[in-house]
Amino acid sequence: MSFHDLHHQGVPFVLPNAWDVPSALAYLADGFVAVGTTSFGVSSSGGHPDGARATRDANIALAAALAPLQCYVSIDVEDGYSDDPDAVADYVAQLPVAGINIEDSTHERLVDPALAAAKVAAIKQRNPELFINARVDTYWLHQEANTATTIERALRYVDAGADGIFVPLANDRGELAEITRNIPRPVNTLPVRGLTLTELGELGVARVSTGSVAYGAGLYAAAQAARAVRDGQPLPRATPYADLQSRLVEYEKRTRTT
């Protein structure tokens, strides 16, 4: 089954988002067949806030590090790190991945949809087989957060060659149903509180990305473990050291043969 096929299974395809090799290995150990990345997790790990084009070089390194894994990889490239569509296409061409996620905002402001569409078109022309997931940030940024604008922007990206549309924080049942009904491509959301995976599928959602949820949960768990030691409480459950080490040993062997 191809990465494209995973978006057409009748039930939403769950894409967990990693920020480094160990997090990706953890997902594979749990049976996932594809891994995305979280730009927030990558930028935060380097001490940078999200959305500031700070992950450009880190993503090149991460894509190369994840390439030996026996799974599909999709990289979150923020806005492509440039306002020049050809420069964005040049950047994406360096990534040995099955898909990318590219957003239509820069520095927390929506950009002209014509520019975002031009980026999608340039990428698709350079790499026709790449799965381009175009993110519409209307709801995420609370800017023109309505179905009409969201659908209008999404259709421009579809016409430019987008294979999927990501609408994070579109959480209302009725709005989600309207969005998926009017976009002729797989629609991607973040987890929606109060809606199960099955219910999201019934609303027409094809893919659910974990986003930064797992990264945030990991930071919370780290602080919780430290508090437990400090306060004399039972330690929380954790993946055993031996399992983590074993995964990395196997990963290192694989990198030597690829």
Q: How would you label these PLM feature ranges?
A:
Residues 1-17, 21-29, 120-125, 130, ...:
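N-terminal amphipathic alpha-helix/helix-capping segment at the start of soluble metabolic enzymes
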Residues 6-23, 48-56, 73-87, 133-149, ...:
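Active-site mouth loops of central-metabolism enzymes
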Residues 15, 19, 100-103, 147, ...:
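Catalytic beta/alpha-barrel core
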Residues 21-29, 75, 81-95, 193-206:
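Catalytic cores of alpha/beta
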Residues 34-60, 79-84, 98-115, 123, ...:
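Glycine-rich, proline-tolerant flexible connector loops at the mouths of alpha/beta enzymes
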Residues 49-75, 110-135, 171-195:
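Alpha-helix-loop-beta-strand connector modules within alpha/beta enzyme cores
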Residues 98-153, 231-247:
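Conserved anion-binding
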Residues 212-258:
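Extended, intrinsically disordered, low-complexity segments
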